[in-house]
């Protein structure tokens, strides 16, 4: 066996072994905990969001309702959220420093505007020269958990890319609760990768550009831009 072939096999084996099969990060509280502990956790979550970003009261209320549902039913953790709102109003900050911090789960950010095709996420076949696994496996490696929070930014920009439909179809498959427990990376054919516990969060500006099937999977939380009074308050703080 050649050195090149050996290195290729070594990369494949190490990449597979590094996948955190069966590992996940539990919620900081459960339904079995006391009422006071659950109440304190919800208050802490609201404090995290308020410290992360000013305003967005309605959006924060929706997020607290969703987290309350997860406390009651942890098995529903594999969810698809979406934060809609104008550019520059703090959607990503709300997700990273509000939601991810409160859930205490590893967080990864993916800029969809920079994705060229679905292979960016799903990898290339092992037989190709210089092939490797895709971005999703990369994220699982880095997070060392099967239930990270993955934030896909600028979903509405995907339709403007050359292979936008291909990427959207991949996202539809990835967020389908009936089949995302059997996600496969092209680099690891025949090996099921369970994404059912991942929290997918999409952010976008223009809701009219979102694929209808994908949008039906989402719990959409709408945010507004800041008015002059809000901007003065932010500047003062």
Q: Over which residues does each language-model region extend?
A:
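Pre-Walker A (pre-P-loop) alpha-helix and adjacent loop at the N terminus of AAA/AAA+ ATPase modules
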Residues: 1-25, 32-84, 136-137
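Pre-Walker A (Motif I) flank of P-loop NTPase domains
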Residues: 75-81, 146-148, 198
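Walker A/P-loop
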Residues: 76-112, 141-142, 172, 212
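AAA+/P-loop NTPase substrate/partner-engagement loops
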Residues: 101-132, 139, 159, 230
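Conserved AAA+ ATPase core "coupling" helix
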Residues: 118-122, 199, 209-237
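AAA+/SF3 P-loop NTPase mechanochemical coupling elements
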Residues: 143-147, 183-203
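Conserved catalytic/switch belt of AAA+ P-loop NTPases
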Residues: 152-193
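Short regulatory helix/loop adjacent to the ATP-binding pocket of P-loop NTPases
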Residues: 163-164, 187-188, 192-193, 205-218
């Amino acid at each position: 066996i050649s050195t090149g072939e050996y290195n290729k096999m070594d990369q494949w084996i190490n990449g597979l072994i590094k996948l955190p099969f069966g590992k996940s990060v539990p919620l900081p509280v459960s339904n079995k905990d006391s009422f006071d502990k659950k109440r304190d956790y919800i208050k802490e979550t609201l404090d995290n969001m308020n410290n992360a970003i000013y305003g967005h009261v309605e959006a924060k209320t929706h997020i607290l309702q969703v987290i309350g549902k997860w406390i009651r039913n942890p098995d529903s953790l594999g969810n698809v959220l979406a934060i809609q709102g104008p550019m520059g109003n703090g959607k990503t900050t709300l997700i990273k420093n509000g939601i991810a911090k409160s859930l205490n789960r590893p967080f990864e950010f993916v800029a969809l505007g920079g994705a060229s095709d679905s292979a960016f996420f799903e990898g290339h076949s092992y037989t190709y020269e210089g092939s490797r696994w895709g971005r999703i496996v990369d994220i699982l490696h880095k997070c060392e958990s099967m239930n990270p929070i993955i934030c896909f930014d600028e979903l509405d920009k995907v339709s403007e890319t050359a292979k936008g439909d291909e990427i959207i179809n991949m996202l539809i498959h990835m967020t389908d609760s009936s089949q995302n427990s059997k996600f496969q990376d092209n680099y690891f054919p025949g090996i099921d990768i369970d994404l059912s516990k991942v929290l997918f969060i999409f952010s976008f500006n223009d809701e009219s550009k979102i694929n209808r099937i994908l949008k039906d999977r989402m719990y959409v939380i709408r945010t507004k831009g800041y008015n002059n009074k809000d901007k003065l308050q932010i500047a003062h703080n």
